[in-house]
Curated annotation (Swiss-Prot):
This is T cell receptor alpha variable 21. Its main location: membrane. The gene is TRAV21. Alpha-beta TR is a heterodimer composed of an alpha and beta chain; disulfide-linked. The alpha-beta TR is associated with the transmembrane signaling CD3 coreceptor proteins to form the TR-CD3 (TcR or TCR). The assembly of alpha-beta TR heterodimers with CD3 occurs in the endoplasmic reticulum where a single alpha-beta TR heterodimer associates with one CD3D-CD3E heterodimer, one CD3G-CD3E heterodimer and one CD247 homodimer forming a stable octameric structure. CD3D-CD3E and CD3G-CD3E heterodimers preferentially associate with TR alpha and TR beta chains, respectively. Keywords: Adaptive immunity, Cell membrane, Disulfide bond, Glycoprotein, Immunity, Immunoglobulin domain, Membrane, Receptor, Signal, T cell receptor. One of its GO terms (cellular component) is T cell receptor complex. SUPFAM superfamilies: Immunoglobulin (SSF48726). The keyword NAD does not apply. PANTHER family: T CELL RECEPTOR ALPHA VARIABLE 1-2, T CELL RECEPTOR ALPHA VARIABLE 21. Residues 1-19 form the signal peptide.
Amino acid sequence: METLLGLLILWLQLQWVSSKQEVTQIPAALSVPEGENLVLNCSFTDSAIYNLQWFRQDPGKGLTSLLLIQSSQREQTSGRLNASLDKSSGRSTLYIAASQPGDSATYLCAVR
C-alpha cells in the first residue's frame, strides 16, 4: 500500500510539473470606494480545463473558497459574488457587488 501511495504522489507531482498552464490576474492591486462594484480578472492560457475556482485570503489566514465554476458552466453566483467563465477566450471575471470594508483581502483564481 505504501508503494502505491508513493507512486500516486509521484504521478500527481509529474502531472503538475508537466502542465503548461499560465494564470494571470489583473489588476494586481485594486482599491475601490465602499459601495462600488469590484471587478477582478483572471486569464489562463490553456482552454482545456476541468474547473476554475476563486479564493479569498485574509491577512495571516488560509485560503477560503468563494466560487467553483465547472468547465461546462458559464457562471456561478453566491450572494454578492458572481464569477463568469469564458473558456474560449481563457478568461474569468469575479464581480463583487456593493463592496464593503470586510471585502478587503487577497483574491486568487486557480484552474485545474
